[in-house]
Amino acid sequence: MHEKDHLPPERMALLFAVMLVTAAGNTAMQSVMPSIGTHLGIADVWVSLAYSWSALLWMLMAPYWARRSDRRGRKAMMALGMAAFALSFSLCGLTLFAGLHGVFGGTATILIFAAARSLYGMFGSASPPAVQAYVASRTGPEERTQALSLVASSFGLGTVLGPALAPLLIVPGLGLIGPFAAFSVFALLVLVTLRLRLPDDDPRFAGRGEVMAAPFSASSNPRLVEDHPDGSPDELPEAEPQHAGGDRLRWSDPRLRGWLAAGVLGGHAQSILLGVIGFLLLDRLGLRHQPDAAAGSIGLVLMCGAIATLLAQWGLIPMLRLGPRASTLWGMGLCCIGTVPLATGLDLHTITVGFAICSLGFGLFRPGFTSGASLAVGRAEQGQAAGIVAAVNGSAYIVAPAIGVWLYNHSHWLAWIVVEALAIGAVVLCVLLMRTPLRTPSHHA
Protein backbone atom coordinates (compact mmCIF):
# COMPACT_ATOMS: atom_id res chain seq x y z
CA MET A 1 0.00 0.00 0.00
CA HIS A 2 1.32 3.46 -0.82
CA GLU A 3 2.32 5.42 2.28
CA LYS A 4 -0.20 8.14 1.52
CA ASP A 5 -3.04 5.71 0.95
CA HIS A 6 -3.88 5.48 4.63
CA LEU A 7 -4.81 7.79 7.48
CA PRO A 8 -2.24 8.39 10.22
CA PRO A 9 -3.31 6.91 13.57
CA GLU A 10 -3.69 10.30 15.25
CA ARG A 11 -6.14 11.49 12.59
CA MET A 12 -8.07 8.23 12.77
CA ALA A 13 -8.28 8.63 16.55
CA LEU A 14 -9.68 12.13 16.12
CA LEU A 15 -12.35 10.96 13.68
CA PHE A 16 -13.17 8.12 16.07
CA ALA A 17 -13.59 10.68 18.86
CA VAL A 18 -16.03 12.76 16.81
CA MET A 19 -18.41 9.81 16.55
CA LEU A 20 -17.73 8.45 20.04
CA VAL A 21 -18.51 11.67 21.92
CA THR A 22 -21.84 12.27 20.20
CA ALA A 23 -23.03 8.70 20.73
CA ALA A 24 -21.87 8.58 24.36
CA GLY A 25 -23.37 11.98 25.11
CA ASN A 26 -26.77 11.07 23.74
CA THR A 27 -27.01 7.79 25.61
CA ALA A 28 -25.74 9.43 28.82
CA MET A 29 -28.57 11.92 28.46
CA GLN A 30 -31.04 9.05 28.13
CA SER A 31 -29.79 7.71 31.46
CA VAL A 32 -30.63 10.86 33.43
CA MET A 33 -33.64 12.36 31.65
CA PRO A 34 -36.29 10.12 33.30
CA SER A 35 -35.00 11.23 36.71
CA ILE A 36 -34.86 14.88 35.66
CA GLY A 37 -38.41 14.74 34.29
CA THR A 38 -39.61 13.26 37.59
CA HIS A 39 -37.87 16.04 39.54
CA LEU A 40 -39.55 18.66 37.34
CA GLY A 41 -42.96 17.08 37.80
CA ILE A 42 -43.38 16.65 34.04
CA ALA A 43 -45.51 13.86 32.62
CA ASP A 44 -43.28 11.11 31.24
CA VAL A 45 -44.72 11.45 27.75
CA TRP A 46 -43.47 15.05 27.43
CA VAL A 47 -39.91 13.94 28.08
CA SER A 48 -40.25 11.43 25.23
CA LEU A 49 -41.79 14.04 22.94
CA ALA A 50 -38.77 16.31 23.46
CA TYR A 51 -36.63 13.53 21.95
CA SER A 52 -39.16 12.99 19.16
CA TRP A 53 -38.85 16.54 17.85
CA SER A 54 -35.08 16.21 17.59
CA ALA A 55 -35.39 12.80 15.91
CA LEU A 56 -37.77 14.21 13.30
CA LEU A 57 -35.37 17.05 12.47
CA TRP A 58 -32.47 14.59 12.26
CA MET A 59 -34.35 12.38 9.80
CA LEU A 60 -35.31 15.36 7.64
CA MET A 61 -31.86 16.95 7.59
CA ALA A 62 -29.60 13.86 7.46
CA PRO A 63 -29.99 13.32 3.66
CA TYR A 64 -29.11 16.97 3.02
CA TRP A 65 -25.93 16.80 5.06
CA ALA A 66 -25.03 13.44 3.51
CA ARG A 67 -25.22 15.05 0.05
CA ARG A 68 -23.08 17.95 1.25
CA SER A 69 -20.49 15.50 2.57
CA ASP A 70 -20.05 14.13 -0.95
CA ARG A 71 -18.30 17.37 -1.86
CA ARG A 72 -15.29 19.10 -0.39
CA GLY A 73 -15.70 20.77 2.95
CA ARG A 74 -15.97 17.58 4.99
CA LYS A 75 -13.86 19.06 7.77
CA ALA A 76 -16.29 21.97 7.90
CA MET A 77 -19.25 19.56 8.06
CA MET A 78 -17.64 17.67 10.95
CA ALA A 79 -16.99 20.93 12.76
CA LEU A 80 -20.58 22.05 12.19
CA GLY A 81 -21.96 18.83 13.66
CA MET A 82 -19.67 18.95 16.70
CA ALA A 83 -20.40 22.64 17.31
CA ALA A 84 -24.13 21.92 17.14
CA PHE A 85 -23.75 19.06 19.61
CA ALA A 86 -21.70 21.16 22.05
CA LEU A 87 -24.04 24.16 21.83
CA SER A 88 -27.18 22.05 22.07
CA PHE A 89 -25.88 20.05 25.04
CA SER A 90 -24.76 23.23 26.82
CA LEU A 91 -28.12 24.94 26.34
CA CYS A 92 -30.01 21.79 27.36
CA GLY A 93 -27.92 21.50 30.51
CA LEU A 94 -28.36 25.18 31.42
CA THR A 95 -32.10 24.98 30.81
CA LEU A 96 -32.54 21.87 32.95
CA PHE A 97 -30.31 23.31 35.69
CA ALA A 98 -32.47 26.44 35.78
CA GLY A 99 -35.65 24.35 35.82
CA LEU A 100 -34.42 22.15 38.66
CA HIS A 101 -33.63 25.29 40.70
CA GLY A 102 -37.03 26.86 40.18
CA VAL A 103 -36.13 29.51 37.60
CA PHE A 104 -38.59 28.01 35.09
CA GLY A 105 -41.67 25.91 35.60
CA GLY A 106 -41.69 22.31 34.44
CA THR A 107 -43.58 22.96 31.19
CA ALA A 108 -41.42 25.94 30.23
CA THR A 109 -38.28 23.95 31.02
CA ILE A 110 -39.15 21.03 28.76
CA LEU A 111 -40.22 23.35 25.92
CA ILE A 112 -36.95 25.27 26.07
CA PHE A 113 -35.10 21.95 26.33
CA ALA A 114 -36.84 20.72 23.17
CA ALA A 115 -35.90 23.93 21.34
CA ALA A 116 -32.26 23.61 22.40
CA ARG A 117 -32.29 19.94 21.46
CA SER A 118 -33.53 20.88 17.98
CA LEU A 119 -30.13 22.45 17.24
CA TYR A 120 -28.63 18.98 17.40
CA GLY A 121 -31.45 17.55 15.31
CA MET A 122 -30.90 20.22 12.65
CA PHE A 123 -27.11 20.21 12.41
CA GLY A 124 -25.78 17.21 14.35
CA SER A 125 -26.32 14.82 11.45
CA ALA A 126 -23.67 16.72 9.45
CA SER A 127 -20.80 14.94 11.23
CA PRO A 128 -21.31 11.17 10.61
CA PRO A 129 -21.46 11.21 6.79
CA ALA A 130 -18.61 13.72 6.67
CA VAL A 131 -16.44 11.44 8.81
CA GLN A 132 -17.29 8.48 6.58
CA ALA A 133 -16.54 10.42 3.39
CA TYR A 134 -13.29 11.80 4.84
CA VAL A 135 -12.08 8.29 5.69
CA ALA A 136 -13.20 6.79 2.37
CA SER A 137 -11.50 9.54 0.35
CA ARG A 138 -8.15 9.08 2.08
CA THR A 139 -7.78 5.32 2.27
CA GLY A 140 -6.96 2.81 -0.42
CA PRO A 141 -9.17 -0.18 -1.26
CA GLU A 142 -7.20 -2.55 0.99
CA GLU A 143 -7.67 -0.43 4.11
CA ARG A 144 -11.02 1.19 3.46
CA THR A 145 -13.36 -1.50 4.80
CA GLN A 146 -11.38 -1.83 8.03
CA ALA A 147 -11.22 1.94 8.49
CA LEU A 148 -14.95 2.44 7.90
CA SER A 149 -15.77 -0.44 10.24
CA LEU A 150 -13.66 1.20 12.93
CA VAL A 151 -15.51 4.48 12.46
CA ALA A 152 -18.87 2.71 12.64
CA SER A 153 -17.83 0.86 15.79
CA SER A 154 -17.24 4.16 17.57
CA PHE A 155 -21.01 4.75 17.59
CA GLY A 156 -21.59 1.37 19.20
CA LEU A 157 -18.82 1.86 21.74
CA GLY A 158 -20.24 5.26 22.61
CA THR A 159 -23.60 3.71 23.48
CA VAL A 160 -21.78 1.55 26.05
CA LEU A 161 -19.63 4.31 27.52
CA GLY A 162 -22.44 6.87 27.80
CA PRO A 163 -24.63 4.98 30.28
CA ALA A 164 -21.53 3.70 32.09
CA LEU A 165 -20.14 7.21 32.63
CA ALA A 166 -23.41 9.02 33.34
CA PRO A 167 -23.74 7.98 37.03
CA LEU A 168 -20.07 8.88 37.62
CA LEU A 169 -20.66 12.38 36.24
CA ILE A 170 -23.45 13.18 38.70
CA VAL A 171 -21.33 15.38 40.97
CA PRO A 172 -22.14 17.76 43.85
CA GLY A 173 -23.23 21.16 42.67
CA LEU A 174 -24.39 19.95 39.27
CA GLY A 175 -26.24 16.79 40.23
CA LEU A 176 -28.10 15.22 37.32
CA ILE A 177 -26.82 17.99 35.00
CA GLY A 178 -23.25 16.70 35.36
CA PRO A 179 -23.35 14.54 32.19
CA PHE A 180 -24.52 17.54 30.13
CA ALA A 181 -21.64 19.68 31.41
CA ALA A 182 -19.05 16.96 30.95
CA PHE A 183 -20.01 16.02 27.40
CA SER A 184 -20.27 19.69 26.40
CA VAL A 185 -16.63 20.07 27.47
CA PHE A 186 -15.64 16.83 25.72
CA ALA A 187 -17.31 18.04 22.52
CA LEU A 188 -15.56 21.42 22.69
CA LEU A 189 -12.19 19.72 23.16
CA VAL A 190 -12.82 17.48 20.15
CA LEU A 191 -14.01 20.48 18.11
CA VAL A 192 -10.91 22.55 18.91
CA THR A 193 -8.61 19.61 18.18
CA LEU A 194 -10.48 18.97 14.94
CA ARG A 195 -10.02 22.55 13.78
CA LEU A 196 -6.33 22.62 14.72
CA ARG A 197 -5.09 19.14 13.87
CA LEU A 198 -7.17 17.76 11.00
CA PRO A 199 -5.91 18.90 7.58
CA ASP A 200 -8.29 20.54 5.16
CA ASP A 201 -9.86 18.47 2.41
CA ASP A 202 -7.47 17.06 -0.15
CA PRO A 203 -9.09 13.75 -1.10
CA ARG A 204 -7.05 11.12 -2.94
CA PHE A 205 -10.02 8.84 -3.67
CA ALA A 206 -13.71 9.27 -4.35
CA GLY A 207 -15.64 8.97 -1.12
CA ARG A 208 -19.25 9.22 -0.08
CA GLY A 209 -21.03 9.66 3.22
CA GLU A 210 -24.08 7.65 4.21
CA VAL A 211 -27.25 8.81 5.89
CA MET A 212 -27.03 7.67 9.50
CA ALA A 213 -29.72 7.47 12.14
CA ALA A 214 -29.41 9.37 15.39
CA PRO A 215 -27.45 7.36 17.98
CA PHE A 216 -30.27 6.27 20.29
CA SER A 217 -28.91 2.75 20.76
CA ALA A 218 -26.06 0.51 19.72
CA SER A 219 -28.11 -0.79 16.79
CA SER A 220 -29.14 2.63 15.47
CA ASN A 221 -26.54 2.38 12.71
CA PRO A 222 -25.86 -1.31 12.13
CA ARG A 223 -23.10 -2.68 10.00
CA LEU A 224 -24.31 -4.68 7.05
CA VAL A 225 -23.78 -8.42 7.06
CA GLU A 226 -22.22 -7.89 3.65
CA ASP A 227 -21.12 -4.31 3.18
CA HIS A 228 -20.82 -4.38 -0.59
CA PRO A 229 -22.78 -7.26 -2.04
CA ASP A 230 -21.87 -6.31 -5.56
CA GLY A 231 -18.15 -6.06 -5.04
CA SER A 232 -15.79 -3.58 -3.49
CA PRO A 233 -16.81 0.03 -3.07
CA ASP A 234 -14.36 1.02 -5.75
CA GLU A 235 -16.36 -0.94 -8.34
CA LEU A 236 -19.44 1.18 -7.77
CA PRO A 237 -20.04 4.06 -10.19
CA GLU A 238 -18.71 7.36 -8.89
CA ALA A 239 -20.99 10.32 -8.28
CA GLU A 240 -23.83 8.66 -10.12
CA PRO A 241 -26.86 10.97 -10.40
CA GLN A 242 -29.74 9.99 -8.17
CA HIS A 243 -32.01 7.41 -9.83
CA ALA A 244 -29.80 7.32 -12.92
CA GLY A 245 -30.28 4.40 -15.21
CA GLY A 246 -33.57 3.25 -13.78
CA ASP A 247 -36.89 4.15 -12.28
CA ARG A 248 -37.21 5.54 -8.81
CA LEU A 249 -37.24 2.78 -6.21
CA ARG A 250 -40.48 2.82 -4.25
CA TRP A 251 -41.36 1.60 -0.78
CA SER A 252 -44.02 -0.62 -2.35
CA ASP A 253 -41.51 -2.44 -4.55
CA PRO A 254 -42.27 -6.19 -4.15
CA ARG A 255 -38.59 -6.95 -3.58
CA LEU A 256 -38.43 -4.60 -0.60
CA ARG A 257 -41.94 -4.80 0.78
CA GLY A 258 -41.39 -7.64 3.24
CA TRP A 259 -38.07 -6.30 4.51
CA LEU A 260 -39.41 -2.79 5.01
CA ALA A 261 -42.52 -4.05 6.79
CA ALA A 262 -40.35 -6.10 9.14
CA GLY A 263 -38.10 -3.07 9.63
CA VAL A 264 -41.03 -0.85 10.56
CA LEU A 265 -42.43 -3.38 13.05
CA GLY A 266 -39.10 -4.23 14.66
CA GLY A 267 -37.91 -0.63 14.70
CA HIS A 268 -41.05 0.55 16.47
CA ALA A 269 -40.79 -2.30 18.99
CA GLN A 270 -37.24 -1.22 19.82
CA SER A 271 -38.04 2.49 20.07
CA ILE A 272 -41.00 1.82 22.39
CA LEU A 273 -38.80 -0.34 24.61
CA LEU A 274 -36.08 2.34 24.77
CA GLY A 275 -38.65 5.02 25.49
CA VAL A 276 -40.25 3.13 28.37
CA ILE A 277 -37.28 1.46 30.10
CA GLY A 278 -36.17 4.43 32.21
CA PHE A 279 -39.65 5.11 33.57
CA LEU A 280 -40.19 1.39 34.15
CA LEU A 281 -37.13 1.29 36.40
CA LEU A 282 -38.33 4.32 38.36
CA ASP A 283 -41.61 2.52 39.06
CA ARG A 284 -40.44 -1.08 39.57
CA LEU A 285 -37.59 -0.07 41.89
CA GLY A 286 -39.78 2.37 43.83
CA LEU A 287 -37.60 5.39 43.03
CA ARG A 288 -40.18 7.96 41.95
CA HIS A 289 -39.64 9.78 45.26
CA GLN A 290 -35.84 9.65 45.02
CA PRO A 291 -35.17 9.86 41.25
CA ASP A 292 -31.48 10.76 41.68
CA ALA A 293 -30.87 7.17 42.78
CA ALA A 294 -32.36 5.81 39.55
CA ALA A 295 -29.68 7.20 37.21
CA GLY A 296 -27.22 4.46 38.14
CA SER A 297 -29.75 1.68 37.60
CA ILE A 298 -30.91 3.13 34.28
CA GLY A 299 -27.30 3.51 33.15
CA LEU A 300 -26.52 -0.09 34.12
CA VAL A 301 -29.48 -1.48 32.18
CA LEU A 302 -28.72 0.62 29.09
CA MET A 303 -25.05 -0.35 29.23
CA CYS A 304 -25.86 -4.07 29.46
CA GLY A 305 -28.25 -3.69 26.53
CA ALA A 306 -25.61 -1.94 24.44
CA ILE A 307 -23.04 -4.65 25.22
CA ALA A 308 -25.53 -7.34 24.21
CA THR A 309 -26.23 -5.51 20.95
CA LEU A 310 -22.54 -5.22 20.12
CA LEU A 311 -22.05 -8.90 21.01
CA ALA A 312 -24.62 -9.76 18.37
CA GLN A 313 -23.19 -7.44 15.71
CA TRP A 314 -19.47 -7.96 16.32
CA GLY A 315 -19.58 -11.59 17.48
CA LEU A 316 -22.62 -13.72 16.68
CA ILE A 317 -23.34 -12.56 13.13
CA PRO A 318 -19.79 -13.02 11.79
CA MET A 319 -19.10 -16.15 13.87
CA LEU A 320 -22.33 -17.94 12.95
CA ARG A 321 -22.36 -16.42 9.43
CA LEU A 322 -26.03 -15.59 9.77
CA GLY A 323 -27.79 -14.41 6.63
CA PRO A 324 -30.31 -11.57 6.52
CA ARG A 325 -33.43 -13.73 6.97
CA ALA A 326 -31.93 -15.78 9.81
CA SER A 327 -30.66 -12.65 11.59
CA THR A 328 -34.03 -10.95 11.32
CA LEU A 329 -35.99 -14.02 12.39
CA TRP A 330 -33.79 -14.92 15.37
CA GLY A 331 -33.55 -11.28 16.39
CA MET A 332 -37.28 -10.79 16.62
CA GLY A 333 -37.67 -14.19 18.28
CA LEU A 334 -35.27 -13.12 21.05
CA CYS A 335 -37.21 -9.88 21.42
CA CYS A 336 -40.39 -11.91 22.00
CA ILE A 337 -38.60 -13.88 24.73
CA GLY A 338 -36.94 -10.88 26.39
CA THR A 339 -40.15 -8.89 26.61
CA VAL A 340 -41.57 -11.38 29.14
CA PRO A 341 -39.09 -10.68 31.98
CA LEU A 342 -39.27 -6.98 31.16
CA ALA A 343 -43.02 -6.98 31.57
CA THR A 344 -43.07 -9.09 34.73
CA GLY A 345 -39.75 -8.40 36.47
CA LEU A 346 -39.82 -6.60 39.81
CA ASP A 347 -36.09 -6.37 40.52
CA LEU A 348 -33.09 -4.88 38.75
CA HIS A 349 -31.54 -8.24 37.84
CA THR A 350 -34.64 -9.58 36.07
CA ILE A 351 -35.25 -6.33 34.20
CA THR A 352 -31.60 -6.15 33.13
CA VAL A 353 -31.66 -9.72 31.82
CA GLY A 354 -34.86 -9.08 29.88
CA PHE A 355 -33.51 -5.86 28.37
CA ALA A 356 -30.23 -7.57 27.44
CA ILE A 357 -32.08 -10.41 25.68
CA CYS A 358 -34.19 -7.91 23.74
CA SER A 359 -31.08 -5.88 22.87
CA LEU A 360 -29.29 -9.03 21.69
CA GLY A 361 -32.28 -9.63 19.44
CA PHE A 362 -32.25 -6.10 18.06
CA GLY A 363 -28.51 -6.46 17.46
CA LEU A 364 -29.30 -9.39 15.17
CA PHE A 365 -32.43 -7.86 13.67
CA ARG A 366 -31.10 -4.48 12.53
CA PRO A 367 -28.19 -5.73 10.38
CA GLY A 368 -30.37 -8.55 9.03
CA PHE A 369 -33.13 -6.22 7.91
CA THR A 370 -30.66 -3.67 6.54
CA SER A 371 -28.61 -6.14 4.51
CA GLY A 372 -31.74 -8.00 3.38
CA ALA A 373 -33.11 -4.83 1.83
CA SER A 374 -29.73 -4.15 0.21
CA LEU A 375 -29.42 -7.64 -1.28
CA ALA A 376 -33.01 -7.58 -2.54
CA VAL A 377 -32.29 -4.90 -5.14
CA GLY A 378 -29.78 -4.41 -7.91
CA ARG A 379 -26.44 -2.66 -7.93
CA ALA A 380 -27.70 0.57 -9.45
CA GLU A 381 -30.43 0.83 -6.80
CA GLN A 382 -28.19 0.52 -3.74
CA GLY A 383 -28.22 4.24 -2.98
CA GLN A 384 -32.00 4.46 -3.16
CA ALA A 385 -32.42 1.35 -0.99
CA ALA A 386 -30.02 2.75 1.60
CA GLY A 387 -32.02 5.98 1.73
CA ILE A 388 -35.28 4.11 2.25
CA VAL A 389 -33.75 1.95 4.99
CA ALA A 390 -32.37 5.04 6.73
CA ALA A 391 -35.84 6.61 6.61
CA VAL A 392 -37.36 3.46 8.13
CA ASN A 393 -34.77 3.43 10.91
CA GLY A 394 -35.23 7.12 11.66
CA SER A 395 -39.02 7.15 11.51
CA ALA A 396 -39.26 4.64 14.37
CA TYR A 397 -37.95 7.24 16.82
CA ILE A 398 -40.29 10.10 15.94
CA VAL A 399 -43.54 9.25 17.73
CA ALA A 400 -43.25 5.60 18.80
CA PRO A 401 -41.30 6.28 22.04
CA ALA A 402 -43.87 8.86 23.16
CA ILE A 403 -46.76 6.56 22.23
CA GLY A 404 -45.12 3.75 24.18
CA VAL A 405 -44.71 5.94 27.27
CA TRP A 406 -48.32 7.15 26.94
CA LEU A 407 -49.54 3.54 26.79
CA TYR A 408 -47.32 2.60 29.73
CA ASN A 409 -48.69 5.44 31.83
CA HIS A 410 -52.25 4.28 31.14
CA SER A 411 -51.50 0.63 31.87
CA HIS A 412 -48.13 -0.92 32.67
CA TRP A 413 -49.12 -3.90 30.51
CA LEU A 414 -50.21 -2.06 27.37
CA ALA A 415 -46.76 -1.01 26.19
CA TRP A 416 -45.38 -4.54 26.55
CA ILE A 417 -48.36 -6.08 24.78
CA VAL A 418 -47.72 -3.73 21.85
CA VAL A 419 -43.97 -4.55 21.81
CA GLU A 420 -44.74 -8.28 21.87
CA ALA A 421 -47.31 -7.91 19.09
CA LEU A 422 -44.88 -5.94 16.91
CA ALA A 423 -42.13 -8.52 17.41
CA ILE A 424 -44.47 -11.43 16.66
CA GLY A 425 -45.67 -9.60 13.55
CA ALA A 426 -42.08 -9.26 12.34
CA VAL A 427 -41.49 -12.99 12.94
CA VAL A 428 -44.60 -13.86 10.93
CA LEU A 429 -43.41 -11.63 8.08
CA CYS A 430 -40.03 -13.38 8.08
CA VAL A 431 -41.68 -16.79 7.89
CA LEU A 432 -44.29 -15.95 5.26
CA LEU A 433 -42.81 -13.25 3.02
CA MET A 434 -39.07 -13.86 2.95
CA ARG A 435 -38.82 -17.29 1.39
CA THR A 436 -37.52 -16.15 -1.99
CA PRO A 437 -33.72 -16.49 -2.16
CA LEU A 438 -31.86 -13.22 -2.29
CA ARG A 439 -29.86 -12.39 -5.36
CA THR A 440 -26.24 -13.40 -5.43
CA PRO A 441 -23.38 -11.01 -6.18
CA SER A 442 -23.23 -12.22 -9.77
CA HIS A 443 -26.77 -11.08 -10.48
CA HIS A 444 -26.12 -7.44 -11.12
CA ALA A 445 -28.94 -5.15 -12.08
Model-derived segments and spans:
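Symmetry-related core transmembrane helices of the 12-TM Major Facilitator Superfamily/SLC fold
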Residues: 177-195, 415-432
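Juxtamembrane intracellular "pre-TM" segments in multi-pass secondary transporters
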Residues: 1-9, 199-261
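Hydrophobic core of transmembrane alpha-helices in multi-pass small-molecule transporters
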Residues: 20, 101-126, 350-364
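Helix-to-loop junctions at the C-terminal end of transmembrane segments
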Residues: 61-74, 309-324, 408
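Helix-loop boundary and gating motifs at the non-cytosolic
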Residues: 5-55, 258-262, 267-288
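Primarily marks hydrophobic transmembrane alpha-helices of the MFS/SLC 12-helix fold
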Residues: 78, 328-329
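Cytoplasmic helix-loop-helix junction between adjacent transmembrane helices
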Residues: 116-155
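C-terminal ends and interior cores of transmembrane alpha-helices
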Residues: 83-106, 334-346
